Amino acid sequence: MDDIVNSVPSWMFTAIIAVCILFIIGIIFARLYRRASAEQAFVRTGLGGQKVVMSGGAIVMPIFHEIIPINMNTLKLEVSRSTIDSLITKDRMRVDVVVAFFVRVKPSVEGIATAAQTLGQRTLSPEDLRMLVEDKFVDALRATAAQMTMHELQDTRENFVQGVQNTVAEDLSKNGLELESVSLTNFNQTSKEHFNPNNAFDAEGLTKLTQETERRRRERNEVEQDVEVAVREKNRDALSRKLEIEQQEAFMTLEQEQQVKTRTAEQNARIAAFEAERRREAEQTRILAERQIQETEIDREQAVRSRKVEAEREVRIKEIEQQQVTEIANQTKSIAIAAKSEQQSQAEARANLALAEAVSAQQNVETTRQTAEADRAKQVALIAAAQDAETKAVELTVRAKAEKEAAEMQAAAIVELAEATRKKGLAEAEAQRALNDAINVLSDEQTSLKFKLALLQALPAVIEKSVEPMKSIDGIKIIQVDGLNRGGAAGDANTGNVGGGNLAEQALSAALSYRTQAPLIDSLLNEIGVSGGSLAALTSPLTSTTPVEEKAE
């Protein structure tokens, strides 16, 4: 070992010792050197005096030095005053507040030194720092609140905050602190139960609070009532508007339905009128065709009957003439001139009787023809009357429907229906009345025609009944005495005068004078232009070319 030490050069040994000493010194320096940071500074006291270190560092030797760390961060110190500790405002009201103070140590040698001297290590504990400076904050809050009313505090919070900040800033600077900002985080009126009525301030504030709350309650009640009234009025207006809209919708629906019904009724009326016109034309065509057929058939039958009657009459006349010639020849041969004259008179009587029978047959034919013509005229009149009445009824119905539709469109919805029903009934009644009037207008002529046709049809029976007394005559003797005013006196046929005419006519006229109920029968015959007093009067319509005048009604 000694050899090794002796073998090392002295300079090297010296160097090693120096390095060791430097290493030891570095370790000691590292252990004694304290650095400051941006968040924390410190104040060193002791050997060498007070030194504030904000950046960099310093040697702190135990026993010789002591350091006080200072927190350079911004600290939030929250102060709450409520219930019985609440603030009293200028108007003697109590308010609960929560105020946050944001403070920090002044970033200066003086500020840090002052903070270290007055606060020490409390800057590292916000709660300890708050407890230390809280009274300053409370004093500033009370002083500022006493200068403002509760409403001013609420309405101008920035003024309150600024007042607190100005009041407390100077006190904080004495501790090396600076106030960054003040925030009023909570503000509310203190409850009434925390007011002490035995305290003058609280009593005054309680009185004002009671007055204010009651006034506000009344105002709130008035507002609530006004709001309720306004809401009800709004609901009423809304309901009224809703009902009005529903009514308008209902009216529009009814109007639309009415228009649809009106259009439908108009279309149905046009269709009905068109169909009625078609039916009328078809019926008129059919009636015309049937009438032409009936007229043709009647004309044909009348022509056949006329030819037949004419032929029979000619044959009968020839037979009568032949018989007369034969009888005259036989009388000339068998009896004298006087007897021949008597037989001739008898032959003339029989000829006249045969002629009367022929005339009666002709009258029957004429009666049949007139009856057919009357029936045809009746049918034509009835068809024309029916057509006219139907046309008038259709026109009245269509016009009534049009008037009803126009009235329905102009009247109210419910009134329209009732009014339409009433007008429809009136229109139908008017149409029926018009039809009845038309029928009544034609009824007299039709009745008269039917009456005359009935008389014509019953004429044979009337004549038969009128000569009923002739059945009691057993026989008729004709005694002709010339020169006794034969045919000289023209008596009235209705009185039964037998004067004038041949023997047959005189005999028949005399027989007719024995008719029963002659006035009544003559009156009935006069209705159709026939006189029943004599054979000539009965056959005058057949032999006369003068038309029978219509009897004035």
Curated annotation (Swiss-Prot):
Q: What are the UniProt keywords, alphabetically?
A: Cell inner membrane, Cell membrane, Membrane, Transmembrane, Transmembrane helix
Q: Which residues lie on this side of the membrane: Periplasmic?
A: 1-9
One annotated Gene Ontology cellular component of this protein: cytosol
Taken from the record's topology, the Cytoplasmic segments are: 31-553
Q: Which family does it belong to?
A: Belongs to the band 7/mec-2 family. Flotillin subfamily.
Q: What is its main location?
A: membrane
The UniProt disruption phenotype note reads:
No visible effect on resistance to oxidizing agents, proton motive force-damaging agents, membrane or cell wall stress. Improved resistance to ampicillin, enhanced swimming ability.
| UniProt protein name | Flotillin family inner membrane protein YqiK
Classification via SMART domains: PHB (SM00244)
- Cross-referenced CDD domains: SPFH_flotillin
Transmembrane segments annotated in the record for this chain: 10-30
Domain of life per record: Bacteria
Q: Name the membrane topology term.
A: Single-pass membrane protein
Described by its record, this protein's role is as follows: Found in membrane microdomains that may be equivalent to eukaryotic membrane rafts. FMMs are highly dynamic and increase in number as cells age. Flotillins are thought to be important factors in membrane fluidity.
Q: Where in the cell is it found?
A: Cell inner membrane; Membrane raft
Subunit: Homooligomerizes.
